[in-house]
């Protein structure tokens, strides 16, 4: 873009709400002093465009969190009403950081979607499976000051295999509960998991 740098815009998308929530917190933590304005598709393209432009004029800085807007297209569903907002965001050079959140995967075959992904820094949060989910759990334990024994990790991997498609949010809730139950050594063992685990599904 000529003159001025592109404002800080990021797109977070995917089918794993827990990871989207984590990425959202990360983005917002960079702007602790700014109020957050959340707008979704119900606000309508015109109102959102007005908000983005009016704030550029009046200079009250804030973070815009724009959720599930049809500027990201699905095949067979096109809404021309959103095109001006799409163009505004693609060329946006105001001062307000914008976080775009889209709770689904994005069809990259659609030209407009591909253009968004090419232009705007983005982070995909897709369902974690198998080893990736075990890795997430290990990191989550570590960040809370807990360790898992190797046989506990194997046990968790086995459960994840068995359950198929278990969301991160379920595992997070489970482990939050374990953290509260364990006193003394912050170690999660296979025996503990066998005695205290919930059954998914």
Go through each PLM region and give its residues.
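Non-catalytic interfacial helical region
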Residues: 2-201
């Amino acid at each position: 873009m000529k003159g001025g740098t592109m404002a800080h815009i990021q797109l977070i998308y995917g089918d794993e709400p827990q990871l989207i929530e984590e990425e959202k917190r990360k983005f917002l933590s960079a702007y602790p002093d700014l109020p957050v304005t959340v707008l979704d598709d119900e606000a309508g393209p015109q109102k959102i465009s007005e908000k983005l432009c009016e704030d550029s004029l009046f200079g009250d800085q804030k973070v815009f969190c724009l959720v599930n807007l049809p500027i990201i297209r699905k095949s067979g569903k096109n809404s021309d009403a959103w095109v001006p907002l799409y163009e505004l965001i693609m060329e946006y050079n105001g001062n307000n950081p914008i976080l775009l959140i889209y709770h689904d995967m994005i069809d990259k075959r659609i030209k407009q979607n591909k253009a968004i992904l090419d232009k705007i820094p983005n982070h995909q949060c897709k369902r974690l499976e198998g080893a990736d989910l075990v890795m997430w759990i290990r990191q989550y334990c570590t960040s809370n000051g807990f360790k898992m024994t190797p046989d506990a990790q194997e046990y968790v991997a086995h459960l994840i295999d068995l359950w198929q498609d278990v969301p991160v949010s379920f595992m997070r809730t489970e482990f939050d509960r374990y953290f509260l139950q364990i006193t003394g050594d912050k170690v999660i063992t296979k025996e503990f998991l066998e005695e205290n685990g919930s059954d998914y599904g």
